Amino acid sequence: MGYMVKLIYTQCKNCGYEWVVDQTIYYMKKYHDMVLTKTYFKPARFYVGDCNTIFNIAYDGIAWCDTPNNIVTKPSNSLKVITTSIWLKEHMEKKGIYVEQVIPRGINDEMAKKHVNFDFNARRGYVIIARNLPYKRIDNTLKMFEGKRKELTLISDHSNADFDFFSLSEDVKYYLLSHALFYIAVSDAEGFSIPPVEAMSVGTPLIYIKKHTYKEYGCGIEMDSIEDLRKIEISKEEWEDLSYKCWYKSLRYHYITVGQELWDWFK
């Protein structure tokens, strides 16, 4: 198969969307021998970003977008829209926006394979990866760990973070995810949140709040409110069962699968 060069746009530098673009470039080359070129400028063939932003700047091509916010902008008739979750697809369709396909964000296959860990005894505590934004509810989570802060590993740009969100390597991030008993997922809104699925990919179950945010991909222990964190109890056998189930569910989000779906749009 010959090289096929396409421009793929990221709406920002040093952000989650650029991470998605970089992962897509790497894995499309690895699995499909397809060369994609990152750009910060339009026009492009393929746009990655927040739906409201992309709909305002892209007039044709393909938008692979998500958003934690209400959709307030409509795309041009020439722009084909791919989104990252069934919930977002349904939300857009209610706004009169046609969605071509649902393709979730992919995880880092290589790191997941390297760090997958089903050993209950090699794990302790809880982990969360989140930007310091109100809807991420970091302060609420920290409050639940008052008096037992050492049990929580917080990866964030929050002032009380254990590791900085922006400087942590992929290798260290996946190592930390694979040595926690649970990943805490309590955000009020997401387009498609990658870190919880990254946790699942190394065998770490989620403790997640009962919201549309996690309905589609959540795996682990569902709770009604963040206060229920205080009530979590689980045996070794129950945890091991959840660990395997969550790992298995995460396979749908590996780039070997996601990339095959994207290939049809890049070819």
From Swiss-Prot:
EC id: 2.4.-.-
The family classification in the record reads: Belongs to the glycosyltransferase group 1 family. Glycosyltransferase 4 subfamily.
Q: What is this protein called?
A: Putative glycosyltransferase 63
UniProt keyword DNA-binding, yes or no? no
Supply the gene name.
Answer: SIFV0063
What GO molecular function terms would the record report? glycosyltransferase activity
What is this enzyme's class at the first EC digit?
transferase
Keywords on record: Glycosyltransferase, Transferase
